[in-house]
Amino acid sequence: MILNLLKKDRELNLEEKNVDLIKMISLLIHAAKIDENYTEKEKSIIMNFIEVSSKKELDKKDIFKLMNNAETHEKSSNQILEYTQEVKKMDLETKKLVLEFLWKIILSDEKSDVYESTLMRRICGLLYLPDKLSGEIKLDIIKEKNK
């Protein structure tokens, strides 16, 4: 029983310490689901984002827990505003990192449909980032894929 309490306490600490990360992951998941095709490739990109953006070393188990928490959070929300509010508070480099991974997710199926492009424009607007920056990041990812 004590072990169960300690385990639950550890899970709460993981979630409490990573609220902003969970919201960023939820935004990525939302983008992945916008074309109604949430693939393993997109999940892999999101897990890579967790590893890159985490402030401390996380083991695979913690990464999966964060991913599951974010998926649950994304399912229960009907708008992106709460996710972008967290990202908007962050520095420019973090915002660029989020945009980069959003584009990696969107372009993971080699195309960007109207809904995905509209989502990216909305996100850039909510984060007060110019479309030009988003376009440059998108082109960099396309060039990287074509190497």
Functional labels for PLM-detected ranges:
Residues 1-33, 37-147:
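Small-residue-enriched hydrophobic alpha-helices in membranes
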